[in-house]
Amino acid sequence: MGGTELMMEKLISELGEDVLKTFQIIPSRVRELDENKIRVLWCHDLPQDPESHHLKNGGWRNFHKIVFCSHWQQQRYLEEYGIPWDRTCVMKNAIDPIDVDLDKKFNTEKDSIRFVYHTTPHRGLALLVPVFDKLCEQYTNIHLDVFSSFKIYGWDKRDEQFQELFDQIENHENMTYHGFVPNQEIKEHLKNADVFAYPNIWPETSCISLMEAMSAGCLCIHPNYAALYETASNWTFMYNYIEDYNKHANFFYNMMEQSIHVLNEKSDSLKIKLKGQKSYADLYYNWEVRKNEWSDLLKSLEHLPRPIEKDTTEEIFTYKVG
């Protein structure tokens, strides 16, 4: 399952199946609407995605509430479809915090610095692999683990265009290609990973991979592209996005090299930063917190009539401009 499916499955497991007796919570892809329930559209896609075009021409009125997974995403949908702000809200994606002793992880002597990439290949793997290959010419004590496949969505054929890249990883002594594995296995691997290397080139509306890496205490290298800056909240090794892929790769090389030096120094300041990063991710992206926020949201919608009527909310006062 991909991120959207994982979020939906987790949400229902946290709130309980009974919530679906009253609410129709639709994760991104609308197939049919249940007029007998309160309808909540939970968007994970980009506004330009064809699956979102049903919101055109007032299509957003079919939903009692439209939920977005980042403020970046919310504002783009509002601009694209003219949706009123008060018809929407933001509920960040969430994770179960990764249980790892950062003092032990930080101070343990290792034979190599472990880099990891654990998202689909089209998001930046083609930039990462040649950069890492070049780094290996100068640094022998580094290793890259790649967990990347469209099989996570059941789209096996889409892997074919990246097969040459996968082969390059498999044939490199300092890289390991793991393909598709269950999310729990990735989280276990993150406990021993040092760097989440993510030269992202695809606009993310949210990034669960980054949340997990932050929780695992990994040094995270990525651009400030789309919603990544919002997810990172200034805790990571973030850089300004570069459209030119060649320039991007060269800049990312420097960031990767810097991370090697920083990790080898084992400075107290880095340790404090990574601990703060983990604390932030564990608190702010925690399912225990998000479950309560979702529960409060749904309770606030319970009174709404199933057929969506024109807003007749009684105003407390009249605000006059000028």
Residue map of PLM features:
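Donor nucleotide-sugar binding/catalytic pocket of nucleotide-sugar-dependent glycosyltransferases
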Residues: 64-78, 83-100
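A charged, aromatic-enriched C-terminal amphipathic alpha-helix characteristic of glycosyltransferases
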Residues: 3-6, 267-308
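Acidic donor-binding loop of glycosyltransferase active sites
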Residues: 191-205, 218
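Conserved donor-binding/catalytic core segment of Leloir-type glycosyltransferases
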Residues: 106-124, 129-132, 136, 145
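Short hydrophobic beta-strand element within catalytic cores of glycosyltransferases
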Residues: 219-222, 229
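Nucleotide-activated donor-binding/catalytic signature segment of Leloir-type glycosyltransferases, i.e.
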Residues: 159-184
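N-terminal pre-catalytic "stem/leader" segment of glycosyltransferase-like enzymes
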Residues: 1-33
